[in-house]
């Protein structure tokens, strides 16, 4: 489960061990809904309080040959505007202006999810 959180025309991303930027999130635990998983992961990884709103898309990402993961991306809204705090799970975190996303080293699926959620957020106002 991955979450797209947009604040002030910027999206929060974390840098992983492969030096790629990615959406924050994580794996489901037993008896946990996808929405519960995402809220828990955002709190653990970034100390952000979010509410997952809708599934944006899903896709399979091949990390290395023979190792693939199913990515399900949600559009999320913040339930409070806490300052994001980096956990030890990632190398860095940063709020990127939406206009910079396409130039980042990150899987195209994440970029598509960010574009989709950004368009929905703009449409709602």
Locations of the language-model features?
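Nudix hydrolase/Nudix homology domain
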Residues: 20-21, 88-125
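A structural signal for short, well-ordered beta-strand segments
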Residues: 3, 55, 74-76
């Amino acid at each position: 489960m991955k979450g797209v959180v947009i604040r002030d025309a910027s999206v929060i991303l974390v840098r992983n061990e492969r030096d790629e930027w990615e959406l924050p999130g994580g794996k489901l635990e037993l008896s946990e809904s996808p929405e519960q998983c995402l809220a828990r992961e955002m709190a653990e990884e970034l100390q952000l309080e979010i509410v997952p709103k809708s599934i944006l898309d899903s896709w399979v990402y091949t990390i290395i040959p023979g190792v693939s993961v199913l990515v399900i991306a949600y559009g999320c809204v913040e339930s409070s505007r806490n300052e994001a705090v980096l956990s030890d799970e990632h190398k860095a975190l940063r709020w990127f202006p939406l206009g910079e996303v396409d130039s980042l080293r990150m899987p195209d699926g994440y970029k598509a999810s960010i574009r989709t959620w950004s368009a929905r957020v703009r449409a709602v106002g």
